[in-house]
A protein has these predicted regions:
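Non-catalytic structural scaffold of enzyme domains
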Residues: 15-40, 47, 53-111, 123-217, ...
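Glycine-rich, histidine-containing beta strand-loop boundary motifs that form or position
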Residues: 114
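Single conserved hydrophobic/aromatic residue that forms the stacking wall/gate
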Residues: 1-9, 13-14
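Catalytic nucleophile-elbow at a beta strand-turn-alpha helix junction centered on a G-D-S/GDSL motif
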Residues: 6, 45-48
Length: 312
């Protein structure tokens, strides 16, 4: 059984397909008569109907259109959201329950794609669910979150710059500053947010800053950058797939108020990353790559090195 964690659009993947970290492996082409394949889209979830329609429902529809040959199923990871939706008569399955349900329906091959932004605790939880379900399927592959490779981050930086920065600077004499506010995490994966901040500035978007609610960069770190850049106008943008509770309460509420107390003119663009068509396409590319490639197990690679392969 295989768990393939697939990196999309990366030169490393292209170079290593057929060897190295990834190898070409067409999951659908390997299926035998009677086998059935399914795509499981996994979301953290939201109780906000308005933003769900613009993000989760939108990407669900887009992936179904992109992969008509696959059965489609969705799952939510947030037990709190699942419980609250159930109280409203809306049923959402957890990833493990969804996988076991699909196996009972005769599905043998599964590709799992989450809409997580970073490879943090939510991805860790998802992979554990997949490990629990592995014995019941012939193959399961797990796609990577939005920001996994350097190329992923470069694409996202370019998309956000084109979406917010270029229109703003063409209309305003005073340069506007943009703050991307992520959820953050207590794990080392929080470094991805600092990477994004660095890459935005390295790409010429010096008026873009990244902050997190529960990780690093902190509010104070971001505030120091705004002051160093002599910003006057600030737009807060959720760096999250869905603009739900955090966006409406923490970003448009607490963060906006704290910045206004510092003397900035502040607005909040309550748009989740999942609303942006180009961001949706990155997730679809991850699925596409996952169907055609799988990651080689590290012990398999070390065995090859021990047998005489020269590069490690």
């Amino acid at each position: 059984y295989e768990i393939a964690q697939c990196l999309v659009g990366s030169e490393m993947c292209i170079r290593d397909s057929g060897g190295g970290n990834y190898e070409h492996s067409d999951m659908l082409a390997s299926m035998k008569p009677g086998d059935k394949a399914v795509l499981l889209m996994v979301h953290f979830g939201t109780t906000h109907d308005d933003t769900r329609a613009l993000t989760i429902d939108a990407i669900n529809a887009k992936t179904q259109a992109a992969f008509p040959e696959l059965k489609f199923q969705e799952a939510y990871t947030s037990r709190i959201i699942i419980r609250r939706l159930k109280e409203r008569g809306i049923t959402k399955l957890t990833p493990l329950y969804a996988m076991l349900k699909l196996r009972s329906e005769g599905y043998t091959h599964l590709i799992v794609q989450s809409t997580n932004i970073i490879d943090g605790v939510e991805m860790e939880s998802l992979r554990r669910d997949v490990e629990s379900a592995l014995p019941f399927f012939k193959e399961i592959r797990v796609g990577t979150p939005l920001l996994y490779s350097i190329e992923d981050a470069e694409k996202v930086a370019s998309i956000l710059g084109n979406r917010y920065n270029a229109p703003a600077q063409s209309k305003k004499a005073t340069k506007e500053h943009f703050v991307l506010v992520g959820h953050g995490t207590y794990t080392p994966s929080t470094a991805i947010y600092s990477q994004m901040d660095y890459m935005l500035k390295a790409g010429g978007l010096t008026n873009f800053h990244v902050g997190t609610i529960e990780g690093y960069p902190t509010f104070d770190t971001m505030l120091a950058q705004l002051k160093a850049g002599k910003a006057k106008r600030v737009t807060l943008i959720p760096f999250m797939f869905v603009a739900g509770d955090h966006a409406k309460n923490d970003i448009a509420g607490e963060w906006k108020e704290m910045l206004e107390k510092e003397g900035f003119t502040v607005s909040a663009q309550l748009e989740g990353l999942g609303q942006i068509p180009e961001i949706q396409e990155i997730f679809i590319d991850h699925i596409r790559f996952g169907l055609k490639h799988r990651m080689l197990d590290i012990m398999t690679k070390k065995a090859a090195y021990a047998a005489g392969k020269d590069t490690e």
